[in-house]
Amino acid sequence: MSELVVALDFKDAQSAIEMAEKVRGVAPWVKVGLELFCAEGPEIITRFKEMGFKVFVDLKFFDIPNTVKGAVRSATRAGADMLSLHALGGERMAVAAREGRAEGAGGEAGPLLMAITILTSMDEDDIPFPVPNGLGSAVLDLALASSQAGLDGVVCSGLEVEAIKEKCGKDFLALTPGIRPASVSDDQRRVVTPSQAVDRGSNFLVVGRPITGADDPAEAARRIVAEMNS
């Protein structure tokens, strides 16, 4: 069954925790991104874990292998349940991330490692270099390389999930941002609705502003979960 991840893209812990309280019991996951993590540090992960959430730490690691290894080790020890890293970092970086996870987990499974292919805010016009076979082909190549390097899945548009599952296997996880009910797209380009994402095989759906910007965030989250399960 697909799971809802609420993106808590706030500038401070108080705002994020207040929103988390509103969706607690509806969404099993929250996402901590760059702004919140840089403002509050690893302690914010602990706060959400104490509230009963699983935590996706979305820092999009992309550096030399040894640096990524250390970052993943630290994030694992901080309690992250899922981490993101760029597929463009290549096999050595992916292997280093797995090593960091193993060291940080102390014999436990550790967090899921999800590779970023192409950001869902981007389309072909945003890529600053030629993509000869198109954006979809590039996403598939990055997904396959991530699978072969032993990562758990990819962060990808819902438009690409079916092709990725076909190429990498159904056990290769897909986490889909750019989820917009009623086709509200704002600054996301490659978007799908909750039901479309689930139908195409997404394992995790990341939703931010349609929930956090709603007059009643809990009800907005419930509607999305209902659509996911319909």
UniProtKB/Swiss-Prot annotation:
GO biological-process terms attached to the record: 'de novo' pyrimidine nucleobase biosynthetic process; 'de novo' UMP biosynthetic process
Keyword Cytoplasm in annotation: no
InterPro entries: Aldolase_TIM, OMPdecase, OMPdecase_AS, OMPdecase_bac, OMPdeCOase_dom, RibuloseP-bd_barrel
Key words of the record: Decarboxylase, Lyase, Pyrimidine biosynthesis
Disulphide-bonded residues: none
Active site positions, chain numbering: 60
GO cellular component, one term: cytosol
Swiss-Prot/TrEMBL catalytic activity: orotidine 5'-phosphate + H(+) = UMP + CO2
CDD domains in alphabetical order: OMP_decarboxylase_like (cd04725)
UniProt subunit comment: Homodimer.
Function: Catalyzes the decarboxylation of orotidine 5'-monophosphate (OMP) to uridine 5'-monophosphate (UMP).
Assigned protein family: Belongs to the OMP decarboxylase family. Type 1 subfamily.
Protein name: Orotidine 5'-phosphate decarboxylase
Organism, scientific name: Maridesulfovibrio salexigens (strain ATCC 14822 / DSM 2638 / NCIMB 8403 / VKM B-1763)
